[in-house]
Design a protein with these regions (language model features):
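Ferredoxin-like alpha/beta domains used as RNA- or RNAP-binding modules
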Residues: 1-174, 180, 203, 223-247
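Basic (Lys/Arg-enriched) interaction patch that binds polyanionic ligands
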Residues: 170-221
Length: 247
């Protein structure tokens, strides 16, 4: 679905929640779709929370709650389930697991993160497709065994990050991306022109686009990072930037 369709659907769900006084929810959203919802003016008054089944989830479901309901009253396990797939041999990759899931006719919006570690993977999904995913017995060329596990059994791995500190003349996309990804401004300019750099999960072709604290920069094929802080200046008048590069 396009971002506009996602926003329209979310706004409809928010109105339904308000009108009926009962919770509503989307399917699993990409980080870009979540960002769009978080910054949609039509949803600024909505009691909206996001859950992905584990603390560091990238793909999340947006829940719209009525005014009488607190966020901690939401039972996430009623909406998100987890499956552990264990390979009999070999170590299938993320693409292999995704191929097996899509091959069963399960839409991507029904599936959350796929956490791959060695010969195992944990798949987050909505309850309506749980039975289908539990029937998976082969991923790529590897036989697998699928079992449901509780969300509490998902290992807490945490995001591995590397702190980056650098200075810029001004907090614009090309300058911040160069410091974050350790690239020359010339190379970054080429990457931006090629559409390989995203600002807050959206392709940005403007080298001078302003970057602020909390923004996420993504370089396709390399990784992504988040701007943790911008402020202060060096003796030469350059601004200090602190960022976290996700590994």
């Amino acid at each position: 679905m396009l971002s506009e369709e996602i926003l329209k659907r979310a706004e409809d769900l928010a109105r339904r929640c308000e009108g009926r006084g009962t919770p509503t929810n989307t399917g699993f959203l990409t980080p870009a779709e979540r960002y769009a919802l978080e910054h949609d003016q039509a949803l600024r008054e909505a009691n909206m929370v996001f859950h992905g089944g584990h603390p560091d989830a990238e793909r999340c479901i947006a829940f719209f709650l009525p005014d009488w309901m607190e966020a901690d009253a939401l039972d996430v396990s009623e909406h998100i389930r987890a499956i552990r797939l264990t390979a009999a041999f070999g170590e299938p990759g993320h693409r292999d697991y995704m191929g097996a899931i899509l091959g069963m006719g399960v839409g991507r919006e029904w599936v959350g993160d796929i956490l791959v570690e060695g010969h195992e993977a944990i798949v987050l999904c909505q309850p309506s497709v749980l039975r289908h995913l539990l029937s998976i017995d082969k991923v790529g060329r590897c036989g697998v065994k699928a079992v449901e596990i509780a969300l509490s059994e998902i290992p807490v791995r945490g995001k591995k990050t590397e702190e980056r500190r650098f200075t810029v003349m001004s907090p614009r996309l090309d300058a911040v991306a160069a410091g974050l990804f350790h690239l020359s401004r010339t190379e970054v300019t080429r990457q931006i022109a090629a559409g390989l750099i995203q600002l807050n999960y959206t392709e940005c072709l403007k080298p001078d686009a302003p970057v602020k604290e909390g923004d996420v920069l993504t370089l396709r094929g390399t990784g992504k990072g988040k701007v943790a802080g911008i402020g202060g200046s060096s003796r030469k008048g350059r601004m200090f930037v602190t960022a976290e590069l996700y590994k």
